[in-house]
Amino acid sequence: MFSSLYPLARASLFKMDAEDAHHLTLRALGAAGRTGLACALSARVPDAPRTVMGLTFRNPVGLAAGLDKDGAAIDGLAALGFGFIEVGTVTPRPQPGNPRPRMFRLPQAEALINRMGFNNHGVDQFVKNVQAARYRGILGLNIGKNADTPIERAAEDYLYCLERVYPFASYVTINISSPNTKNLRQLQGAGELDALLAALKDKQQRLADLHGKLVPLALKIAPDLDDEQVKEIGDTLLRHKIEAVIATNTTLSRAAVQGLPHADEAGGLSGRPVFDASNEVIRKLHAEVGNDVPIIGVGGIFSGEDAHAKLAAGAALVQLYTGFIYRGPALVSECVKAIARERSA
């Protein structure tokens, strides 16, 4: 039902400030989940099970982190047919993020620019929200560092968040690729990444012993990487036996949107313009890691054909964000059906 109404809703939402529309939508989805009205949103999406990271996904099309930073609308979002939900990014302490305005639509390019800056209510509130959700499907919890934590002490923030979210996560994503937290992408460097992943894997094993379950770790990387950087990241993922990698986050490049309104705004660009760059990183990364580190492909998916292209490049699963904002819930079913068709062909 909601899928058919979304074009009308979008017309109204797109007349609003982008962040105001975002919050309004989240509040509505959160209320629907809390009151049991989520069933009215339910989308008819066929099952297309896939096992990745030792987890069985209802279908291979998930929601990317960033839409629901605090995990406040999990049940409402789950009703839209996603095979898995990822929420966050969350940091140890609450923080307001960057000053507004900080989210901009580029409709001519079917894109968004954001410089949100990990705005969230902190990991303690995040965990309460996750615990309150009734959703029992695959839930990824995405963690980051506070803006005022020196980059040299970033590992402390990730380790703290990992310990707090671990009991409630199907998998945990380590976000080191947002362009909106100063120096964060330095953690993608070979030495920094090696040290961070070593600490996280050690913590993961100790938490697995404590809780009696191994929760997989996924690393989220940027599209703005050269061939050598992709190779180094691939080698590091293999060496530390990281369970998955999410490719990719937003881009700093403006090559595809030059001259458009808001194109010069600072922040990460997402949507259709990042599709090719994301796919290229997926292809190169898959050449390095093969099937030993499953890739979750995200960036610029606006159709079932786009979703299949991610899998053809080497991804095992896909996630939606900006395409979902522009296309609505109908995109989820379209992607699942396209992937199922190609798989059976």
UniProtKB/Swiss-Prot annotation:
EC number from the UniProt entry: 1.3.5.2
Gene3D superfamilies, A to Z: Aldolase class I (3.20.20.70)
InterPro entries: Aldolase_TIM (IPR013785), DHO_dehydrogenase (IPR050074), Dihydroorotate_DH_1_2 (IPR012135), Dihydroorotate_DH_2 (IPR005719), Dihydroorotate_DH_cat (IPR005720), Dihydroorotate_DH_CS (IPR001295)
Record's subcellular location: Cell membrane
Cofactor annotation comment: Binds 1 FMN per subunit.
CDD domains: DHOD_2_like
Binding sites annotated in the UniProt record for FMN: 65-69, 89, 142, 175, 220, 248, 271, 300, 321-322
Domain of life: Bacteria
Recorded topology in the membrane: Peripheral membrane protein
Pathway(s): Pyrimidine metabolism; UMP biosynthesis via de novo pathway; orotate from (S)-dihydroorotate (quinone route): step 1/1
First-level EC class: oxidoreductase
Entry keyword set: Cell membrane, Flavoprotein, FMN, Membrane, Oxidoreductase, Pyrimidine biosynthesis
A single cellular component GO annotation: plasma membrane
GO biological process, one term: 'de novo' UMP biosynthetic process
Active-site residues, Swiss-Prot/TrEMBL: 178
Binding site for substrate: 69, 114-118, 175, 180, 249-250
Reactions catalysed: (S)-dihydroorotate + a quinone = orotate + a quinol
Assembly: Monomer.
Stored PANTHER family: DIHYDROOROTATE DEHYDROGENASE (QUINONE), MITOCHONDRIAL, DIHYDROOROTATE DEHYDROGENASE (QUINONE), MITOCHONDRIAL-RELATED
Function: Catalyzes the conversion of dihydroorotate to orotate with quinone as electron acceptor.
Family indicated by similarity: Belongs to the dihydroorotate dehydrogenase family. Type 2 subfamily.
HAMAP family for the chain: DHO_dh_type2
Official protein name in the record: Dihydroorotate dehydrogenase (quinone)
Source organism (scientific name): Burkholderia cenocepacia (strain HI2424)
